[in-house]
């Protein structure tokens, strides 16, 4: 233990330049890098997620457009809401219509709403 205490004391007395030089020497001698591997893996994870295609979507009614009554009918059909609830949802646009749906279903909902005159976003 006495030897470790001496090493700790010597390392504590190093200047910043000397410590950096020591790190370089140890990296070369042991063939390692002082960079934290966790930081590298964490930085690579978001890139991998971005590369994977999104599977679940949220259909958002951006605006009802000019044919509000038609849009309310379609929203009622898609969501299973009553007429009053569907009207309220359309009036409060932008508002999510349906969440966690597969791409094909989201595209189908989007096309129905757009055919009724609404502006729709997939998120």
From Swiss-Prot:
<dbReference type="GO" id="GO:1990904">
    <property type="term" value="C:ribonucleoprotein complex"/>
</dbReference>
<dbReference type="InterPro" id="IPR014719">
    <property type="entry name" value="Ribosomal_bL12_C/ClpS-like"/>
</dbReference>
<dbReference type="InterPro" id="IPR013823">
    <property type="entry name" value="Ribosomal_bL12_C"/>
</dbReference>
<dbReference type="Pfam" id="PF00542">
    <property type="entry name" value="Ribosomal_L12"/>
</dbReference>
<keyword id="KW-0689">Ribosomal protein</keyword>
<comment type="subunit">
    <text>Homodimer. Part of the ribosomal stalk of the 50S ribosomal subunit. Forms a multimeric L10(L12)X complex, where L10 forms an elongated spine to which 2 to 4 L12 dimers bind in a sequential fashion. Binds GTP-bound translation factors.</text>
</comment>
<dbReference type="InterPro" id="IPR036235">
    <property type="entry name" value="Ribosomal_bL12_oligo_N_sf"/>
</dbReference>
<dbReference type="GO" id="GO:0005840">
    <property type="term" value="C:ribosome"/>
</dbReference>
<comment type="function">
    <text>Forms part of the ribosomal stalk which helps the ribosome interact with GTP-bound translation factors. Is thus essential for accurate translation.</text>
</comment>
<dbReference type="GO" id="GO:0006412">
    <property type="term" value="P:translation"/>
</dbReference>
<dbReference type="GO" id="GO:0005737">
    <property type="term" value="C:cytoplasm"/>
</dbReference>
<protein>
    <recommendedName>
        <fullName>Large ribosomal subunit protein bL12</fullName>
    </recommendedName>
</protein>
<keyword id="KW-0687">Ribonucleoprotein</keyword>
<dbReference type="GO" id="GO:0003729">
    <property type="term" value="F:mRNA binding"/>
</dbReference>
<dbReference type="Pfam" id="PF16320">
    <property type="entry name" value="Ribosomal_L12_N"/>
</dbReference>
<comment type="similarity">
    <text>Belongs to the bacterial ribosomal protein bL12 family.</text>
</comment>
<dbReference type="InterPro" id="IPR000206">
    <property type="entry name" value="Ribosomal_bL12"/>
</dbReference>
<dbReference type="InterPro" id="IPR008932">
    <property type="entry name" value="Ribosomal_bL12_oligo"/>
</dbReference>
<dbReference type="GO" id="GO:0003735">
    <property type="term" value="F:structural constituent of ribosome"/>
</dbReference>
């Amino acid at each position: 233990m006495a030897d470790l205490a001496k090493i700790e004391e010597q390392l504590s007395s190093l200047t910043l330049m000397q410590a950096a030089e020591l790190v370089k020497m140890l990296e070369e001698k042991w063939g390692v890098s002082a960079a934290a591997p966790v930081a590298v893996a964490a930085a690579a994870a978001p890139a991998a997620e971005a590369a994977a295609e999104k599977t679940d979507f949220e259909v958002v009614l951006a605006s009802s457009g000019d044919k509000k009554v038609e849009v309310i009918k379609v929203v009622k059909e898609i969501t299973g809401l009553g007429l009053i609830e569907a009207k309220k949802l359309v009036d409060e646009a932008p508002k999510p219509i349906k969440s966690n749906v597969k791409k094909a279903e989201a595209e189908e909902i989007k096309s129905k709403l757009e055919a009724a005159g609404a502006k729709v976003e997939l998120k």
